[in-house]
């Protein structure tokens, strides 16, 4: 088992996702510092910051589709390294920007590149490892990957923002040297030889059963991005509404949450192997997330340390990201697997936009605490229902195609 878990495929996928998360988190951390350095101030820091985030998200949504289709048509390995190469170049270029236009272009290109990494890596790992070890493989990928956020925080604190981007680009380019030792998935090669139609993204929407399977695979991840995108991102505002004693910064809340995610991804992956079930583990983590979210809204007049610990616990509770992507990939045949594995995580990331939209509406009507709780209740309820509708995939033989 040890040899399988530390095969070149698993190591490259894990390190690729590590650099992927580093870049995703780095922008959030250096946003203000970098925008001030190119001459922005005041309200522009927020307005242009939102623009850059939207450009990155647009790139990720587009990239998820592009890389997914290419992953099923051209191969998992080509896409894995193609995505690493693209976001590494974008990161390096980002260190040279001096205008908001150039910054936005770099974030858009980086978003496209970042979109392909996780899906291609997970697809390659679950197709290469024996079925009894698949969960362990994705556990390693996610656990190592999430620690990229910790490195991003460290680098941003000790280096200039331009240097931080150069480091991210350099780390990605270093990974390309491992390409010579990684081989394509045998399942993909078998399907390729048969000349079967592959990567037909539209086919996910033309068959009712397949569409709802795809939709439910995505929606079980809603609580993850509700917690990260709302409760953690807007933690200073929630802390003020809860009369938390002591200063609360979004940066520290994010780091606390991601530290919890490291343990959550490891724990959920390990439990899924011990229980021999994906659904039971996601159910357990959803129940825990419901409890932690309810507790979050009851943190009246606590110290900032207790608040940060709750952020850590929340990160652990929604740390089923690896299982989420694994379930999505295992639901579909070899000719659509990379398409699903690449689009599902990026589409669920994209739900931050409608979640934030409804959060703002609910806040206007009910206040930040009640409004936030209502949105959370809806997201978690949808996730429970979607999980119920999905089939268990732990013992599933993945060597098949979608007709």
Regions found by a protein language model. Give the residues of each.
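Extracytoplasmic gate region of multi-pass secondary transporters
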Residues: 28, 210-265, 352-356
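Helix-loop-helix hairpin linking two adjacent transmembrane segments in secondary transporters
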Residues: 141-180
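Helix-to-loop junctions at the C-terminal end of transmembrane segments
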Residues: 64-75, 265-277
């Amino acid at each position: 088992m040890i040899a399988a878990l530390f095969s070149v495929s698993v190591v490259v996928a894990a390190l690729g996702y590590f650099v992927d998360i580093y870049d995703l988190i780095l922008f959030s951390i250096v946003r203000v510092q970098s925008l001030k350095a190119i001459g922005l101030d005041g309200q522009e820091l927020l307005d242009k910051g939102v623009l850059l985030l939207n450009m990155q998200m647009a790139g990720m949504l587009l990239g998820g589709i592009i890389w997914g289709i290419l992953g099923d048509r051209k191969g998992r390995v080509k896409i894995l390294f193609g995505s690493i190469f693209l976001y590494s170049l974008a990161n390096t270029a980002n260190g040279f920007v001096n205008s908001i236009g150039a910054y936005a272009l770099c974030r858009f290109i980086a978003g496209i590149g970042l979109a392909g990494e996780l899906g291609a890596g997970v697809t390659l790992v679950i197709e290469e490892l024996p079925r009894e070890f698949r969960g362990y493989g994705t556990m390693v990928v996610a656990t190592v990957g999430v620690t990229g956020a910790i490195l991003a925080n460290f680098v941003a604190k000790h280096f200039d923002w331009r240097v931080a981007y150069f480091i991210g680009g350099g780390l990605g380019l270093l990974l390309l040297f491992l390409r010579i030792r990684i081989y394509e998935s045998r399942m993909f090669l078998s399907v390729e030889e048969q000349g079967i139609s592959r990567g037909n993204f539209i086919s996910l929407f033309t068959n009712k059963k397949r569409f709802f399977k795809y939709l439910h695979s995505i929606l079980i991840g809603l609580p993850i991005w509700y917690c990260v995108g709302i409760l953690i991102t807007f933690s200073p505002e929630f802390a003020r509404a809860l009369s938390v004693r002591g200063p609360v910064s979004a940066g520290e809340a994010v780091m606390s949450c991601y530290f919890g995610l490291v343990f959550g991804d490891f724990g959920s992956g390990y439990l899924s192997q011990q229980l021999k079930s994906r659904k039971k583990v996601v159910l357990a983590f959803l129940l825990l997330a419901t409890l932690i979210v309810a507790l979050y809204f009851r943190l009246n007049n606590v110290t900032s340390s207790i608040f940060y610990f709750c952020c850590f616990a929340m990160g652990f509770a929604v740390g089923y990201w690896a299982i989420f992507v694994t379930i999505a990939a295992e639901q579909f045949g070899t000719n659509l697997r990379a398409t699903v594995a690449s689009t599902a995580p990026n589409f669920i990331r994209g739900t931050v936009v409608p979640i934030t939209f409804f959060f703002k509406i609910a806040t206007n009507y009910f206040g930040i605490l009640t409004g936030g709780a209502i949105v959370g209740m809806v997201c978690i309820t949808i996730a429970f229902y979607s999980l119920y509708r999905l089939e268990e995939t732990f013992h599933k033989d993945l060597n098949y195609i979608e007709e």
